[in-house]
Structure formats: C-alpha cells, structure tokens
Amino acid sequence: MPKIYSKPEVLRGLIEHLPRMEPVSGGARILPWRPSESDYGRTVDAVLASFRPRFASAMREQAEAPGLLAELLRHTPERRMILIRNSRRFRNLALCVLLLEASRQEGYRDSMEGERLADLVLVLAHRLDPEWYGTRVLEDVRARCFMLIGNARRVASDLWGAEDAFRTAETHLRQGTGDRLERARLLFLKACLCRAQRRFPEAASLFKRAASVFRAAGELHPAAEAIIGLALARQYQGEPEEGIRLLREANGLVDPQIDPELHLYLRFNLISCLAEAGRSREAEALLARSPEVRQIPDAKRRLWVLWLEARIALGVGDPSRAARLLVRVRDRFVERGDGYRAALACLDLAVVCLRLGRTSAAKRLARTVIPLLLALGIVREALAARILLEQA
C-alpha cells in the first residue's frame, strides 16, 4: 500500500467522501456507522500486516541481488546456467532485474553475451513462484527477456531471428500486467529493427508512438532516445534537415550529467545528419570540437566514427581518404563477423570508387554485396547496388 494511504486520517477522508446512502425499507442504512479512530487504526494495521512478509522479502532480495549477480558473472556461461537451474539461492526477482540490465548493456558491446544473459533470466523466471511474485509480473519479465534477445540479434545482424524474438515478446506482453512503458520499450526496439531492415516509414511510426508514451509518463531520456531513432529514420529517408531538427528537440530532453552516453550518441548523430545534409564543413567542425566522440571506449562504436569520418571526407572533396577509411571499416566489420554492416560499407566504398574513376572495382564490390543484402532482406540497398552496377 502506498504510504499516503496508510495514514488513518487519509483513509477517514476517503470514506467520508463516499456518497451518503438513502434509507431503504425498514429504516436500515448502508454504511450507517462512523468508525472510531481505533477502528481505523486496527484496519490499517491489518492491511499492513498482510503486506509485511512480502515487503520484508522484497527488501531482502534487493539487498542480496548485487552479490548474487557478481557471483554469477565470475563463472563461465555453462556454470551460470547450472547454478540458476539447481540453486535456490538464485531464485530472486531482483536478480532478474539486474541480469536484464546487464543483458541490455552487453547486447550492444557483445551481442552473444547479451543474449546468453537474457536466456539465463528466462530459465530463472520459470523457477520463480508465480503465486508469490504474480503470474503477470513474470510474463513481463519473459517479455523483457525476448525484447533483449531480439535486440542482441539485431545488433548481430540476425534480422530474421530478431523478428521471431519480438513476436514472442508481444505474446508474453499480452499476458502480462499491461504496463504501457513495457509496451513502449518493445515499440522502440521494433522500430530499431525496422530501421535496420530499411523499412523507414514503419520505423518512423513506431519511434513516434514510443516517444509519445515515454513523454506522457515523464520518462524524458527514453523519449529522447526514441526521437533520436526517428531522426535517423528521417535521415535515411533522405530528409537530413528534418533529422537535424528532431535531434535538436531531443537535445532539450537530455541531461548530460545523468546520461553522458546518450548525450554522446546524440552528438554523434547530429554530426552524421549534418554530413548527410551536405553540410560537411559544419560536420567536420563539430567533430573537431567533440573529441569525446572519437574517444568512445567501445571498439564497435569507434568503427561508426571511422565510417562517419569517411562520409565527411567525401563531402569535403577528399575521396581518396574516404576510400582508405571505408576499406578499414569494411575489413573490421568482416573480422567481427558482421556481414550486414560490412555489406553496407562495401556499397559506400563502391560509390567512392566510382567517384575516383575506378569503375571495375566499383562493379566488383556491387556484385559482391547484392546477394548478401538480398539474403538479409535489405531490398532497398540491394536495388541501389544493382542500379550502381548497371550505371558503372
């Protein structure tokens, strides 16, 4: 029970504001008595007593969860699963929450580890008592697991697998608590997948819906993240100026002291939109004033910065440097096993090769990427590669 409703004077006020009942036959009245202060006290004590065991258990779980998480993460993935399956110590809902956050963070750095951690939570959720925790709450936990599995697969370029995971997440959400924020999180992640599949109008619609829910709930940073996603969808649709406007709107929602990573992500995408809008000199100047963008600690994200530098180099009239940078980007994505992004980098490199008059190299690159893009379901870029091949 919320604290405000545990005070006798508040409960008395609520009851006093109930409609007065008219007499019924025989002169009897419904709710004819006015309880005394001691009656209120006994009622409140009885209600609170029924919550105390659960409250004490939740507090104990929250206190134990960080230590349990640290213990789990010291082990190999195989050993973690054995512990989750067999040790009652780990049957803790607060531990599920911490594991889900660890999965979310790892899903961007190491998609395989992110998916493994979400799988761990799935197994754990099936071992939690639905009578104690609530069936609908556990359905929300399972939904979040499949959201994170889907996102990890998207990051790993398994776009079909991501779709399957998001469908399963929707099934669990329908059986869950009906939390609008959980639904908004799924809308946001599905929008990211649609953007990766180059289904930009659908992505834009989903980002808008997610941002609206987050804003209505006062969740400003998730709302900003959804607006940034919308800005990128607009940029990829050929509307970079609209993307710039949206990014500046998102900037007003982000506190860099609270979430410096989100602020950095926003700055990176503003530079990207400026380059796409043909404002390459502005993009170059903003990148020079943003050393933190080049110093991103995550190796994969540093590849995105190299890719951005290649686009800026092309925009300011240095295609040779753009080609050198794109070769590095392509090769690094190949080394990481990221065929989707390697193919997109190849397509950019083919365009630069045409600019440099290297027609045969451009044709070879286009022929290489077409089957891979089609296999991934990226029809828009596959068509662009086909047109480039025909015009080269």
Where are these regions (language model features)?
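N-terminal alpha-helical interaction modules that lie
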Residues: 10-119, 123-130
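Alpha-solenoid helical repeat architecture
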Residues: 91, 132-144, 174-185, 189, ...
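C-terminal non-catalytic interaction modules
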Residues: 2, 36-41, 46-47, 54-64, ...
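Tetratricopeptide repeat
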Residues: 114, 120-124, 162, 168-170, ...
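Alpha-solenoid helical-repeat scaffolds
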Residues: 83-144, 148-177, 181, 185, ...
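Amphipathic alpha-helical segments of tetratricopeptide repeats
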Residues: 122-132, 167-178, 208-219, 248-259, ...
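Tandem amphipathic alpha-helical repeat scaffolds
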Residues: 57-68, 96-111, 141-158, 182-198, ...
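Short Cys/His-based metal-binding microdomains
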Residues: 1-9
